[in-house]
Structures are given as structure tokens and as C-alpha cells.
């Protein structure tokens, strides 16, 4: 989380720090504003404060009956597993036993992610390579709180959950291979419409 905080400051806010001391050259994609830039370097104390803030944020609580009713949500939860979504969007992980904060040790975390990188194919690729991740590799997005979001996928390209699900399907091209999720999306598309809606209701309840 500390590195995440530091990188977000550097990349999203343009604020260098001890972990990321150099500005990124964003010239090719920028529209320059006439106002001058501020030279801001954030201290380790600021980064630690941001890290602690995120570490102790309470998770969003799922709805038991909204939308669609409890029975629909329960059916959707079961379908989420049977079609294969849960293979990557793992419902529950456990926090580490060793931590500076015992209150956070060995806790069930219902984030719906395996926190792993997966090849998603050219359809979702942003061509941004970072570390060992290629331009079509993405960490599985946690789904807790997805019911409160207005836009979906890494670039917010859609406000429709069904479109977001189907965007996981992508054939390979000369640059990237096919999406790892193709079989799962085929399973989803094969569901009766009522079961598809149950799955959407379950996601909206998170």
C-alpha cells in the first residue's frame, strides 16, 4: 500500500517523492495548460498517512435484498461460481497473520479478486507495460462495492455491467493472445436471460 500511495501521487497527481523521485514524461498525450505547474515533493510522513487511511478504510457492505430480492441474489451468487467468474474474482481471501496491526491479522476479506495478473487480450489492452506486466495484463479488479459504481473496467468505458462482462471476451491478434476469460464469457452467454439477470443482481448487491 505504501508503494501504491507513492506511485499514485507521482502518476496521478504529479507529486514526486522518495520512491518515485522523477516526473514521468507525459508530453505525447498532454494538452498543455497555460497555468504554471507547482513543484511538489511529498514527504514520507504524508505517504504513511495516506497508507494508513487506506489500510483502515472499512469495506463496503453488500445488500441482502437489493436489487431483485434475496432469492435472485442468492441464485446469482451460485451462478457466479458455476460459470467460472470466481476462478479469478475469488470471493474471499485472508489477510496475513503477521502484521503491524493485530486487529487486521488473519481476517476474511470478501474482495472478489485473486489479486493476480491475467491476460485479457487485445479488446481490453491499453498497451501500457509496467514491470513484468504486458499491455494486455491486468490485476483482477476487486468487485466489492461494484454495485455503487457508475462506470466499469479499467478505463471506465461503459456504465453497463453486461457490456463490462462481455468486454472480457477477446480473440487474439498478432500482438496479444486471446483473453483468459473467453470460456467464462461463453458460459455466461449460454445462460437463460433470467439467470443472467440473477448474476447482474448479485453483482449489483455487492
Regions found by a protein language model. Give the residues of each.
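Periplasmic c-type cytochrome electron-transfer domains
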Residues: 1-206
Amino acid at each position: 500500500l505504501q508503494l501504491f500511495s507513492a506511485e499514485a501521487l507521482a502518476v496521478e497527481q504529479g507529486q514526486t517523492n522518495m520512491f518515485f523521485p522523477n516526473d514521468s514524461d507525459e508530453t505525447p498525450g498532454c494538452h498543455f495548460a497555460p497555468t504554471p505547474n507547482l513543484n511538489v515533493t511529498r514527504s514520507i510522513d504524508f505517504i504513511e498517512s495516506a497508507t494508513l487511511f487506506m489500510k483502515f478504510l472499512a469495506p463496503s457492505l453488500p445488500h441482502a435484498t437489493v436489487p431483485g430480492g434475496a432469492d435472485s441474489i442468492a441464485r446469482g451468487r451460485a451462478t457466479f461460481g458455476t460459470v467460472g467468474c470466481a476462478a479469478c474474482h475469488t470471493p474471499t481471501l485472508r489477510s496475513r497473520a503477521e502484521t503491524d496491526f493485530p486487529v487486521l491479522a488473519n481476517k476474511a476479506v470478501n474482495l472478489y479478486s485473486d489479486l493476480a495478473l491475467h491476460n485479457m487480450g487485445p479488446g481490453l489492452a491499453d498497451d501500457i507495460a509496467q514491470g513484468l506486466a504486458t499491455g494486455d495484463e491486468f490485476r483482477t479488479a476487486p468487485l466489492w462495492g461494484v454495485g455503487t459504481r457508475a462506470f466499469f473496467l479499467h478505463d471506465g468505458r461503459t456504465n453497463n455491467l453486461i457490456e463490462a462482462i462481455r468486454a472480457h471476451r477477446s480473440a487474439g491478434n498478432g500482438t496479444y493472445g486471446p483473453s483468459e476469460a473467453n470460456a467464462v464469457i461463453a458460459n455466461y452467454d449460454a445462460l437463460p436471460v433470467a439467470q443472467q439477470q440473477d448474476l447482474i443482481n448479485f453483482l449489483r448487491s455487492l
